[in-house]
Design a protein with these regions (language model features):
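Short glycine-enriched loops at secondary-structure junctions
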Residues: 101, 128-130, 175-176
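Redox-cofactor binding/interface segments in oxidoreductases and associated redox assembly factors
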Residues: 78, 85, 125, 170-172, ...
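Active-site glycine/GP-rich loop and adjacent strand/helix microenvironment
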Residues: 1-13, 17-30, 34, 144-303
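Conserved AMP-binding loop of ANL adenylate-forming enzymes
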Residues: 109-146
C-alpha cells in the first residue's frame, strides 16, 4: 500500500486532530461568515460550545437549497483579494484560497495513489478545465510524477490522442466516459470517475477496466473527499479534512454502524467558504471493519 502517514494514524490521534480543526473552523466561520454567524446566533450557539466532536450536533444544519440560494459572498470569510480561484459548476460557485487549493491537491494525490496511479502512469484527463476539479487532478498527477495528457472535450481528437500516447489511466466524469465509450473501445487499465450525485460505481459493469469512483459534489468544492482504494471495498473518507455524520433522514439522530443514514458533511479546513453540517441527501452506511488496504480512515458504501 502506498499511503501517507495521516491515512494510517490511530483513531485517537485522528480524533484529536479533528476536534482541533473543528474548533478552529467553527470559530473562523462565526467570526468571518455572514451566513454562519447568522445561523449560529439563531441557534444560540457560540464557538466555545464546541468542546468535543459530539458537540457538532449543537450546530445548525445547512441544506443544499441554502447553499444554492444564498449569495456565495455571504459564505465567504475573506476579501476577494485573498481568493486565488473562483469556479462555477452546476449553478454553484466555489471560491478558494491558496490553502484550499493545497488541501485539494493533497487529497487528490491520496485518491490517485490509492488507485495505483504512480510515477510512470500515463493518465488522460477528459474534460473541460473550466471545471476546476480537473486542475486539482492535473496538479496532483504532476506532483506524483505521472505523465499527463489533457484530452479536452472535442470528441474528434480523443481516439487519436489515446492511441498515440498509450494511455493506461482515464480520469473524467461519468457522462464523458460513457460518451467516449459509445464510439471507442476503452483500452485503459484504470478509470477514475468524478461522481457528483452518488458514490456508486455503476461504470464498473460497462468496462473491463478497474473503476475507481470519487464522490465529488459541487457543494464540497473538492474532488477527493471520498475515494476507493485498490481493494475496492467502499469509499474511504478523508477524515483529517472532513467530519462526517450518518443521521436518520429528517432527524438529528445518528444511526448505528452498519445501518444506512443520511450523509452529513463538515469541511474541517475550508478557508474561503466553510461548509458546516451540510445535509447531502445521500444515503450511505458505515462499514465497520478495517479495510484490508491498511488505511485507518473509515469507509462508507451505498446501501
Amino acid at each position: 500500500m502506498l499511503a501517507d502517514k495521516t491515512e494510517c494514524i490511530s483513531r485517537s490521534e485522528l480524533e484529536i486532530l479533528q476536534l482541533e480543526r473543528l474548533k478552529k473552523i467553527v470559530a473562523w466561520a462565526y467570526e468571518r461568515s455572514v451566513f454562519y454567524r447568522r445561523t449560529f446566533q439563531s441557534r444560540g450557539v457560540v464557538p466555545d460550545d464546541i468542546r468535543t466532536l459530539a458537540d457538532v450536533r449543537r450546530l445548525p444544519f445547512v441544506t443544499t437549497e441554502e447553499l444554492h440560494s444564498v449569495d456565495a459572498l455571504d459564505f465567504l470569510t475573506l476579501p476577494l483579494s485573498s481568493i486565488i480561484r473562483i469556479n462555477r459548476r452546476d449553478e454553484f460557485t466555489n471560491l478558494y484560497t491558496k490553502g484550499d487549493i493545497r488541501a485539494n491537491v493533497e487529497m487528490m494525490i491520496r485518491a490517485l495513489m490509492a488507485a495505483d496511479v504512480l510515477r510512470g502512469s500515463i493518465a488522460g484527463i477528459l474534460g473541460d478545465f473550466a471545471d476546476s476539479r480537473f486542475l486539482d487532478v492535473l496538479y496532483a498527477l504532476e506532483s506524483i510524477g505521472a505523465t499527463v495528457v489533457p484530452l479536452g472535450t472535442d470528441c474528434r481528437r480523443w481516439s487519436d490522442m489515446i492511441e498515440l500516447f498509450s494511455l493506461d489511466t482515464l480520469i473524467s466524469t461519468p457522462q464523458l466516459i460513457m460518451q467516449l465509450q459509445k464510439s471507442f473501445e476503452l483500452p485503459f487499465t484504470k478509470i477514475i470517475s468524478l461522481n457528483t450525485s452518488t458514490i456508486g460505481n455503476d461504470l464498473q459493469t460497462r468496462t473491463s477496466a478497474k473503476v475507481f469512483s470519487l464522490f465529488a459534489p459541487p457543494e464540497v468544492g473538492h474532488a477527493g473527499m471520498m475515494y476507493r482504494c485498490a481493494d475496492a471495498a467502499g469509499h474511504h473518507v478523508q477524515e483529517d479534512f472532513f467530519l462526517i455524520e450518518l443521521l436518520r433522514f429528517g432527524s438529528d439522530e445518528p444511526v448505528t454502524i452498519g445501518d444506512a443514514g443520511e450523509l452529513v458533511v463538515t469541511a474541517l479546513t475550508a478557508q474561503a467558504m466553510p461548509l458546516i453540517r451540510w445535509r447531502t441527501g445521500q444515503a450511505v452506511r458505515r462499514m465497520g471493519d478495517l479495510c484490508t488496504c491498511g488505511r485507518e480512515f473509515i469507509r462508507v458504501a451505498t446501501p
